[in-house]
Each structure stands twice: as C-alpha cells, then as structure tokens.
Amino acid sequence: EFLMEWLPKQCNKHKWAPCTYQSNLGTVQNLIIPYIGDMQMQKLKPYHLEDLYATLGKTPCGQYYEGKKQVLSEKQQQRLLSGTTIHEVHRLLRTAFQYAVEWGILVKSPVPVDSPKKSTQERSIWDVGEMQAALASMEDPILHLAVHLTLVGALREGEVAGLTPEDIDFDAADGMGTFTINKSMQRIQKASLAKTGKDCILREFEDKREGSNTVLVLKKTKTASSCRTIFMTEALKNELKHWFKRLEMDEAVDPERYRNSGMLLRLPNGLAVEPVLIRKKFEKWQDAHPAFPHIVFHGLRHSSATYQLMISGGDVKAVQGTTGHASANLLVNTYAHIQQDSRKKLGKKFEEGFYKPGATPVQAAPVEAEPT
C-alpha cells in the first residue's frame, strides 16, 4: 500500500516520463507486491528482503504481469530474472524506505546495506562481417531500412521508428547527407500517461483497436545528449532516396484510403511502423537465418557502437556523438568488452613493438633461494 502511494508522489516530484513511471510501477506490481505485499512495513527486516532477492533470482521473467500470475511455457520458465533486474528492485526499495524514514513511518530502513550484484555477462553482438552479410540477406524493405539506419547511427529501436522525412537532409555536410535524432516512438500504458502528464509527448497516434489500454506516442528523446545528427553513408543515402519514391508510389495506389502517418517508416497503407513490429520482423528474419548468432534488435546498436569504437581507434568522444550516450564514461563502461579478433591483433602489435629485432632479449628473472 505504501509503495503504491509513494510512486505517484515521486512521479509528480521528479517529473517522471510515462515510461519511467510504467517501469517502476511494473517493478512494484510484479516483483515486490506478489512476494512481500502482505507483510507489515514495521515488521520487515533485512533478511526478509534478502529472501526476496534470492527468490527473484530463481523466478522466470514475466511470472507476473500487472500483478497477476501468468502461465508460462517450459521455454519461458527457463529464462530467469537477471541480476540487473534484482538490483533495480533493491534500488527502488532503498529509495522508497528512505522516504518512509524521512516521513516518520519507519524508524529505520529494512533494506540491506549490500545491493545484489548486477549481471556482468557480455552483450551478444555481431562483428562487421556478420552485420554486412545480415543486411545483404534482408529482403523485407522496412526491415532492411530500419536495420541499415540502426547500424549506421547506432540507434535505439524507438529512435529509428521515430524518424520523420523532415529529419532527412540529403544536402547537409557538403552533400554527404545527415539524419537527425530528436524524438522517439513508444507504446505506453494510458494509465501511466494519465499519471505523468504529457509534457514530454509530442504526438499521440490514433488507435483503432477498441478497448486498448495502451497508446502509441512520439515523445522527446531520453536525454539532451540523445539529440544528435548522424552522417549518412552513400549506400544509406541511395536507399533512403529509393524509399521516398516507394512512399510516393504507395500513396498513389489509393490516395483516398492512404493514411499518411507522417513517419519515415510506414506500412503500405501509410500507418506508422512501431518498434514492436520492427522487433517482430527482426525475430522472424533470425528464425529464418539460424546461421547468424542470435541477438536482440537492440544488439544491433551495440554491434554498431563496438565497431565504431574499433575503427576510430578508441575515439570515445566521436563515437559518443553518434550513439547519444549521456557521458563518455557510460559509453566506455557499456562497451568495455572487445571482440576476440581485436584482442588477437592487439597481442600481435604488442609483440611486434615490445620485442623489436635487435633489442636486448628479455631475460627471465633469476629465482632466488628462500632465506633459511
């Protein structure tokens, strides 16, 4: 009860975006209340929360949705909550109970001092050869353009879906061409939108589905650094020019029934291509091409950023300008991994530079006898 009262107050105080409120609400409804929701706050002890973290570590993703227990398939039951998710539960509880102490509801916070460790497994990415081969094999024009834009600009899926024709400038940068990232598309809960207000919302799309509790929106980017200009490649520039011709042809087929959404990525009837459709198209392509390492669509952003760091010689600030990370440190920490091929090359360069021909051979240090 306390958490459900605390959330809206925090939302109003900190001007949360709808997606932030929705994410935190989901954490409370699905990862906290089902397990300790019946306990009195005053009786909560650190070991109760340690038990919660341990239980969550054995819990499948999606076990609860909107507070209701879900029936999961055998395959779904094998995908457990990550350490990062459990860490977020701890972070939310720590903040909430700090307020409970400040408001005089509790004398002391029951949240353990030590937080659960975040997941540290490396992200699955493609190397440059896999990126090139995958793009060449994609026949769906919507998917091809979405992936091409994502690889060139290291985009988030909401950013690629949020592009409009006005964001494309073929003459910029002395004819090189650019596209601008300044908004993002997302489907959010109507209830979350009602709680947070519409300050960050640029546009709501019409939804013909009756009784839907979600709405597709175009919103401001995540942070100021997320607004950025990306330089085109010649291949992408040519594809975009052909795409604009395709949009004109689609509208000419039946102008009266064509519903121009105003977005760059559109279905043949003019409606916007939302992020979930891009993900589904990518998943369908992956199922049909099992030879490629399996990655999520967001993995294309990581693949692109990793490759750009490699070819730039580690120019973090230049790559940050493309990826839109909030800070250089965040970029470095996110992409601290390096591909095996690059590590081999680095080892070879070290060997060639350190053991130069004619240099004094490196001798092993003599082993001294231990004192008696």
Question: What is each residue range found by the language model?
Answer:
Residues 32, 49, 93-96, 104, ...:
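Conserved hydrophobic/aromatic pocket- or pore-lining residues that grip, position, or stack substrates
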